[in-house]
Regions:
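Conserved structural scaffold segments of CAZyme catalytic domains across common CAZy folds
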Residues: 1-89, 98, 377
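Conserved, mostly hydrophobic/aromatic
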Residues: 41, 164, 252, 311, ...
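Aromatic- and carboxylate-enriched substrate-binding clefts and catalytic-loop regions
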Residues: 52-232, 236-238
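Acidic/polar loop patches that form or flank catalytic/metal-binding clefts of enzymes
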Residues: 161-168, 195, 258-266, 270, ...
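Glycan-recognition and catalytic regions of carbohydrate-active enzymes
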Residues: 262-310, 345-353
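Carbohydrate-binding surface patches
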Residues: 293-333, 379
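Solvent-exposed beta-strand/loop surfaces of large extracellular or lumenal domains
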Residues: 339-365
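C-terminal beta-strand-rich structural cap/linker in extracellular carbohydrate-active enzymes
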Residues: 358-385
Length: 385
C-alpha cells in the first residue's frame, strides 16, 4: 500500500476526556463523528481516518479484561458499512484499530474473521495495541510467546493485504525486510505521554535523543503533530516543545505511516497546518547535516515522488542558532524554501505557539540561518521550481 499521512484520529479527544472509548453520551467513535473526520481528511488530502473505540470490549476495565474485545462487532452507533462506503466516495479509507488489552489468544482466534471483514470494506491498514504489561496475563511482550504472536498477526495481515502499525510491540529487529506490510510500530515513549504522564511529559531532550537510539532500529510511530497544548485533565502535563518543533518532528522521526495526533478543530485555520498536509512520508534520500545526541538534530529528506526536500531541525531546552548549508540540493536547480520557524519570544515552557512562516529563494549555495527557541525547532519545505 502507498505510504501516506492519515489525518488526525479519533483518539486524542479521549485523552482530553472530551470523548470516551466506551459507550455512553461522550462516545467518540460514532458514525457522525467519523464522517466529519472523513470530510476533514478529504478536504486536506489525507488518505485515511483512524478510529479508536469503535468495537465492543471498551466498557469497564478493558486493559485487564482484553478477552472481551470483539474485532468484528461494532458498537450500535458506529455503522461500519455506511462509514466505509462514505469514505470511499471521498477517496479516503478507514484505518482499523485493534486494541487487545494484551489478550493475545483472544485476538488470534479472531484474526482471520476480522481481517477478512476489513478487506471486504476496503480497510487496508490496522493499528494494533497491547495495553497490558503481560500477554494473556502470563508472558512478557518480548518473550518467545510474544514474538510468535506478533509475527502471526503480521503474517495473517499480509494474507489480506493489510498493513500493520503495531503499538506496545516487541523491540524492532528489522522484520520489515521479511514482512513489508509491517509499516511502522511504536516501541518508544511517544507523544501520548504528553497527555497524561505524571512526570509532565517527554522532556525537550527526549526527541533529540531517540533518533540515535530507537530510530536506528526502524520506523517509529511517535504520533507528532499536537497543536493545542492545553490539558484540562492533567494541567501539569503537555508537550515540552514549541509548535514549530512539532512540525519538524514529522521529518526528524521517520515513519512511512504518520498519524497527525490532534483534534481537527485544533488544525482548522492554522497556517502551520500547511506543513503537515504537505509533508510526505516516503523518502528517496536522507542526509544529516548536523546532530549531537541529546542536544540537536537536523535531518533533510528528499521526497520519493518529486524533486522536493523537507527539513526538520530541532533543539533541546537550549536556544540555538543553526547555520544550514543546502549543498545537498541539485546544483543546477532553483528552489523556493517555505520556512516554519519559532516566532518571537517562543519557548516550550509558557509560549509554545508563535510560528513565523517565511519564503526564500534558495539553491545549493545557500546557507540558511535558523534561530530556534528553547525546546524549539524549524520545519522547511524546499520546492523545486
Amino acid at each position: 500500500p502507498k505510504t501516506a499521512w492519515p489525518p488526525t484520529c479519533i483518539w486524542w479527544g479521549m485523552h482530553m476526556k472530551k470523548q470516551t472509548w466506551e459507550q455512553g453520551p461522550k462516545h467518540g467513535a460514532t458514525t457522525e463523528n467519523t464522517m466529519n473526520y472523513i470530510d476533514f481528511a478529504a478536504k486536506h488530502g489525507f488518505s485515511g481516518v483512524l478510529v479508536e473505540g469503535w468495537n465492543y470490549g471498551w466498557d469497564g476495565d478493558w486493559s485487564a479484561n482484553g478477552d472481551q474485545f470483539s474485532f468484528t462487532k461494532a458498537y450500535p452507533d458506529f455503522d461500519l458499512e455506511k462509514i466505509t462506503s462514505y469514505a470511499a466516495s471521498k477517496g479516503v479509507r478507514l484505518i482499523g484499530h485493534n486494541e487487545t488489552g494484551g489478550a493475545a489468544q483472544n485476538y488470534e482466534a479472531q484474526l482471520d474473521s476480522a481481517f477478512a471483514l476489513y478487506q471486504k470494506y476496503g480497510i487496508n491498514a490496522v493499528k494494533t495495541g497491547y495495553v497490558n504489561p503481560l500477554l494473556d496475563h502470563k508472558e512478557l511482550h518480548g518473550s518467545q510467546y510474544g514474538v510468535r504472536h506478533y509475527r502471526k498477526v503480521i503474517e495473517t495481515a499480509a494474507k489480506y493485504n493489510i498493513m500493520i502499525d503495531n503499538h506496545e510491540p516487541v523491540m524492532p529487529t528489522g522484520l520489515q525486510r521479511t514482512y513489508p506490510n509491517l509499516m511502522t510500530q511504536e516501541g518508544v515513549r511517544g507523544q501520548e505521554y504528553d497527555a497524561w504522564s505524571a512526570d509532565g511529559g517527554n522532556p525537550p531532550e527526549h526527541t533529540t535523543t531517540i533518533p540515535f537510539t530507537r530510530g536506528l532500529a526502524g520506523p517509529m510511530d511517535f504520533t507528532p503533530g499536537t497543536f493545542n497544548f492545553n490539558n484540562p485533565v492533567h494541567p501539569q502535563t503537555h508537550p515540552q516543545t514549541t509548535l514549530a518543533k512539532q512540525l519538524a518532528l514529522a521529518v526528524v522521526l521517520y515513519s512511512p505511516l504518520q498519524m497527525a495526533s490532534d483534534m481537527i478543530e485544533n488544525y482548522e485555520n492554522n497556517p502551520a497546518f500547511d506543513f503537515i498536509t504537505s509533508c510526505p512520508t516516503n523518502w528517496a534520500k536522507t542526509v544529516v547535516p548536523e546532530a549531537k545526541i541529546g542536544e540537536y538534530v537536523t535531518i533533510a529528506r528528499k521526497d520519493r515522488d518529486s524533486e522536493n526536500w523537507f527539513i526538520g531541525s530541532i533543539t533541546n531546552a537550549s536556544p540555538r542558532e543553526v547555520n544550514l548549508p543546502l549543498s545537498f540540493l541539485d546544483a543546477n536547480a532553483s528552489y523556493k524554501a517555505h520556512i516554519f520557524a519559532d516566532g518571537e519570544e517562543a519557548n516550550y515552557k509558557n509560549n509554545p505557539y508563535p510560528v513565523t512562516i517565511t519564503e526564500e529563494n534558495v539553491n545549493s549555495s545557500t546557507v540558511l540561518t535558523l534561530k530556534q527557541a528553547p525546546g524549539g525547532g524549524t520545519a522547511i519545505m524546499i520546492i523545486k521550481e
